Amino acid sequence: MNALTHFDAQGQAHMVDVAGKAATHRIGIAGGRIEMLPSTLAIIEAGTAKKGDVLGIARIAGIMAAKKTSELIPLCHPLALTRVAIDFETDQADETRASSIFCTATVETVGATGVEMEALTAVQVALLTIYDMCKAVDRGMVMTGIKLLEKHGGKSGSFVNGT
């Protein structure tokens, strides 16, 4: 197993020095789901939520979150992102599962460090925004399965999450 990189020899937290790393094209893709009542999903799909266009606003929130990640996660480097895409896929309930929306965030940069945290932050904030905009009709919504799906670029190469 690799050593933790955010601690020095004395065990103190520090921001990793990436000055000597090559700038490469980096991609981070994260995903996560919010489960809800079928009636809540119907409101979102019909565009009749009292607070407005739920998925449109959640998309903008996810993009903003990716750009602000270094302000939220203490040891993340501020990055010049070259692309942030937020996509949603709705899924109607059946006998085996709740209605839900799956969010995917794809973040890219050309730089010395990856964009996995930016993608994960984008997904979480997009899902939180859906919750915020719909909590008046469904306080039981559950965010689940938030994870890194893929990472490409840099010295460590590619990672594709098999779970």
Curated annotation (Swiss-Prot):
Any Pfam family hit: MoaC
Protein name: Cyclic pyranopterin monophosphate synthase
Its EC number(s): 4.6.1.17
InterPro entries: MoaC (IPR023045), MoaC_bact/euk (IPR047594), MoaC_sf (IPR036522), MoCo_biosynth_MoaA/MoaC (IPR050105), Mopterin_CF_biosynth-C_dom (IPR002820)
Listed SUPFAM superfamilies: Molybdenum cofactor biosynthesis protein C, MoaC
Active site positions, chain numbering: D132
Keyword annotations of the record: Lyase, Molybdenum cofactor biosynthesis
TM spans (from-to): none
GO MF annotation, one: cyclic pyranopterin monophosphate synthase activity
Keyword Lyase assigned: yes
Presence of keyword Lyase: yes
Complexes and interactors: Homohexamer; trimer of dimers.
Annotated source species: Albidiferax ferrireducens (strain ATCC BAA-621 / DSM 15236 / T118) (Rhodoferax ferrireducens)
NCBIfam families, alphabetized: moaC (TIGR00581), PRK09364.1 (NF006870)
A GO BP annotation: Mo-molybdopterin cofactor biosynthetic process
Family in the record: Belongs to the MoaC family.
Pathway assigned in UniProt: Cofactor biosynthesis; molybdopterin biosynthesis
Record: residues binding substrate: L75, C76, H77, M117, E118
Catalysis performed (reactions): (8S)-3',8-cyclo-7,8-dihydroguanosine 5'-triphosphate = cyclic pyranopterin phosphate + diphosphate
Protein task: Catalyzes the conversion of (8S)-3',8-cyclo-7,8-dihydroguanosine 5'-triphosphate to cyclic pyranopterin monophosphate (cPMP).
